[in-house]
Amino acid sequence: MPSLNDIRSTFLDYFRRNGHRVVESSPLVPRNDPTLMFTNSGMVQFKNCFTGLEHRDYTRATTAQKCVRAGGKHNDLDNVGYTARHHTFFEMLGNFSFGDYFKSDAIPFAWELLTKDFDIPKEKLLVTVYHTDDEAAEIWKKVAGLPDERIIRIPTNDNFWMMGPTGPCGPCTEIFFDHGPSIWGGPPGSADEDGDRFIEIWNLVFMQNEQHPDGSMTPLPKQSIDTGMGLERIGALLQGKHDNYDTDLMRSLIEASAHATSTDPDGPGKTHHRVIADHLRSTSFLIADGVMPSNEGRGYVLRRIMRRAMRHAHLLGAQDPVMHRLVPALVRQMGAAYPELTRGQALIEETLKLEETRFRQTLERGLRLLEDELGHLPEGSPLPGEAAFKLYDTYGFPLDLTQDALREKGRKVDVEGFEAAMAEQKAKARASWSGSGETKDAAIWFDLAETHGATEFLGYDTEQAEGQVLALVAAGAETASAGAGQTVQIILNQTPFYAESGGQVGDTGELRTDTGRARITDVKKGQGLFLHFAEVVEGEIRQGQGATLVVDHARRSAIRANHSATHLLHEALRRALGDHVAQRGSLNAPDRLRFDFSHSRALSPEELAAVEAEVNGFIRSNGAVETRIMSPDDARALGAQALFGEKYGDEVRVVSMGTLAGSGKGTDGQTYSLELCGGTHVSRLGDIGLCVILGDSASSAGVRRIEALTGEGALAYLNEQMKRLTDVAAALKAAPAELVDRVKALVEERRQLQNEVAQLRREAAMGGGAASEAKEIGGVKFLAQVVQGVPGKDMPGLIDEMKARVGSGAVLLISDTGGKAALAAGVTPDLTDRLSAVTLVKAAAEALGGRGGGGRPDMAQAGAADASQADAAIRAAEAVMGG
């Protein structure tokens, strides 16, 4: 009995002998078709070959293509485990011709392989053809000798294939195996065709026409062939089984599940084992192809499949995670044919274990709630929609998981009630969002989010991807297209562009379609949508088009460096200043970073230098930057820093950097920086290059702000500083190494000169000013003098000199500084108990139009607007003294 691995090899070897290139399976995430969630047929990777957009160095190909059907219109999830032939993961064997051979070769190839290489009895086979395809019918008669009653003409679209509303299309012929009258069912096209007697095993599509938008159809210049045969189905047939799950490959996985759960593979838990075996394949291959569990897009479908399998493991009595323990059995069976499975084994096992560990507690709570709800219901009645919605909203149970759990109990869910509860929640969210102060056209984003769901972000793994234009918004309204010069917001099904959040600015780059090109100038996020702000620079961008999306690599790299440096800076500040340091805000732009943190005082130059040195030390260490997805509680248990006041969902992205013995953070207790973060980061710390702190300033009360540069920006800054240093050295005629001593000498020289100048000014003022002889008023000597151009800062020294001249008494000095007056008064210490300099200077200032004045009893100063009435000011001071 041939194994499935043998059957796969036989198929590929047959077509290799017949001039076909054996092409390896494409990934489950389509490279060139953004309209598909997953690769679901063999022709997906050849789509552009069929349409003429791509030309390869071969015209004949054969593949064993891995496929997933678990979302959209191709969704087999609900039936998996309960039927003989439904799978989420399957292999599609196919042969293809791109303008090379056609029906007269494709049909003989199929017949020869089935009847000779696979040794299927000819009398067990029959075929269908499109009702007008006389050519195919005649070839079947000639090649296989089939009578008319075993060539069934089908008038429906079951036998006419179309790539889409327009494009290549053509009739197809399907080959069926007859299990005999002991199995119920009728031939294709009959009322009993859904029975299991006649099973389709191979479909041959003849691409011979092109469908036009007006509905007309014309012959293709080059006719092509696309065939598909499910390996699991042909394997069951060749192994004499009526159930795909009884084939050798699936049976080995079922037995591995039974062994891991200590249960009978064919006992009461038979269905559970079948679900686990199927879902093990789809989850493992999806993870190997780069899909990780998340709450949106492909990651959400993966999570649904995982959780469905995990629920069935729970029903088998498993108390600990099971799925990851089955991966080695899968690798043994399929690793040789698909090396990516072997390469990704460690990641697959870790991801499955983490997801099952997190989901187990949620699952147990959810199932208890489900049992409680059922306990209050009459036997056989459906679960109310409100209860199903609570399971979904509170415990993360998708509706199909609840339906699956109830299916075993013979119950259903009130789906209409569930949808009503969902609609009510959306209405509340809409009302809340509309009243949150957003712009007047905010409702359109809510509508688009409801229609299209969240945008899937691909940017952690790539800077270039294919996407589909779901919507265009201009001036607050949807539009079908946008032409050159227009600015629009573009909604895509998936994107590599990062949307502004967490202090990191949005990406920029380019979007290209078959009809136009747009420059992406910013990306923001709203209601789970990524809003791509764009300017159409060429041609036209249309809704529904596929698009090539390219992020500005240099700009993204600079942003990554700044963001990763911010994490290092945060940790270095905590270590230098204390655990009270917490992030209060940040900006990670391409040209700089800014980090706000809780701290009450300015940092000293020595502290800043130490922080900068520590950051650069870790940059030079070139340690790996790693990210993991986990629950917020698990992240905090590992010591991860969270943003103050931020609300987190049921899973977070944790970024770790650097190694520091005894840090107490991370799984090994030796992680330097560990933070919750959804931003993009460098792969290794050395990619940051360099970090230069520009300075520390106050942001608000109790919050300091550090600004810094990294990478090329930091290098450019240092080069500019060096240039300035060189220019200063040249101006001072000194070597750069001598500058500090040279500047110190200049400062000291300047200080001495300033002192000399001040002394000369005082001497000039005292010698050249309008002076009066000291007079005696009320028994006290009084000396007044008017000078020119003496600044207020030099006047206290002159007052001291005047007091020395009188010995005992009071003095007044008035300086004309460009029409304005600076005044100073002094009283010798022996008289301050009788007379105050403050009183004297205020009286003099008022006479010159000034107000106020202050100081000490022995020395006071004031200012006034008019120095021309100096004599009046002197008389006013004399009057105060009693003169």
UniProtKB/Swiss-Prot annotation:
It is an enzyme of class 6 (ligase). The keyword Metal-binding applies. GO terms for cellular component: cytosol. Its EC number is 6.1.1.7. PROSITE patterns: AA_TRNA_LIGASE_II_ALA. Its main location: cytoplasm. Binds 1 zinc ion per subunit. It is found in: Cytoplasm. Belongs to the class-II aminoacyl-tRNA synthetase family. Catalyzes the attachment of alanine to tRNA(Ala) in a two-step reaction: alanine is first activated by ATP to form Ala-AMP and then transferred to the acceptor end of tRNA(Ala). Also edits incorrectly charged Ser-tRNA(Ala) and Gly-tRNA(Ala) via its editing domain. Consists of three domains; the N-terminal catalytic domain, the editing domain and the C-terminal C-Ala domain. The editing domain removes incorrectly charged amino acids, while the C-Ala domain, along with tRNA(Ala), serves as a bridge to cooperatively bring together the editing and aminoacylation centers thus stimulating deacylation of misacylated tRNAs. This is Alanine--tRNA ligase. It comes from Cereibacter sphaeroides (strain ATCC 17023 / DSM 158 / JCM 6121 / CCUG 31486 / LMG 2827 / NBRC 12203 / NCIMB 8253 / ATH 2.4.1.).
